[in-house]
Amino acid sequence: MKKYLKYGIMGLIILAFALIRPRPQQENSPNGIRDYAEIVRSGVLRAVTEYNSVSFHIQDDTLGGLHYELLHAFAQAKGLKVEITPEMSLEKRTQGIQDGTYDILANNVVKNSERKDSMLFTHPILLSRQILVQRKPQEKNDSTYIKSLLELANKTIHVVKSSPSIIRIQHLSNEIGDTIYIQEVERYGQEQLLAMVANNDIDYAICDENIALTSAHHLPLLDIETAISFTQFYSWGVNKDNTVLLDSLNTWLEEYKQTASFQELIKKYTLN
């Protein structure tokens, strides 16, 4: 049981942080979705993100993260305050955008056919890939070590529940002509899956490359050399009816991405 204690502690920290956040109250619009004018009138922008070393985190009693800093830069430019809620469940983050609990889904969101009908996506913010996470071989003929994606046949890969990587794994299964078993994990985020691989709790996981690269410094037993996807554009998401907010975000992003401040943030929080 002790080996699972660390994951429970991670979950409790995230839960405690979420509980002390003020609960967003839906207002004004009959469908619960605040348009940009309502956001401006309220003076508060509500965002949801994943708690991890890239998006949003606490270090030495200080809040930080790429999306944390981007959100504050946007809010400052628009004269708004920002409320950020950490939520480990991708499903709950997405549902919160759809029902108006949050205005912006501010983490690395991949635009795909399943999501394009449920939300709108900003212009791309950064590039990344999905990486197979496994342990480095402990001996010459380590049977669990994957040298080629073909060797994933009949293996079980753990992913965050509703992760876009599920579609890629399914396509990969078709490409190699054999079954790849997918185990969706609702309770933990990507960094927790990395720790579980490192501690022999599971053998394989899929993770965003930037998160994997950041975590690999603390988990030297991990192998993160095998990509399962091409490089993809990552964006933010907003409700499909919130076109004015989308336009405001896109206009600001296109200007901000040309600044030295943006380049410094990318260097600070990604290792690509």
What are these regions (language model features)?
Residues K6, Q25-V109, S113, D117, ...:
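Extracytoplasmic small-molecule ligand-binding "clamshell" domains
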Residues K6-R21:
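Hydrophobic membrane-insertion alpha-helices, especially the h-region
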Residues P22-P30, E69-A77, R135-P164, F233-N272:
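Extended ligand-binding regions for polar small-molecule ligands
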Residues R46-V54, T62-Q76, L132-D178, Q183-G189, ...:
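Bilobed "Venus flytrap"/periplasmic-binding protein-like clamshell domains
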Residues Y51-N52, L126-Q134, E139, Q190-E191, ...:
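Periplasmic-binding protein-like
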Residues Y68-Q76, E91, Q95, D99, ...:
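Solvent-exposed, polar/charged alpha-helical surfaces in well-ordered, non-transmembrane soluble domains
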Residues E91, Q95, N108-S118, R168-E175, ...:
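A ligand-binding cleft/hinge motif common to bilobed small-molecule-binding domains
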Residues F121-T122:
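Short Trp-Ser/Thr-centered turn/loop motifs at beta-strand boundaries
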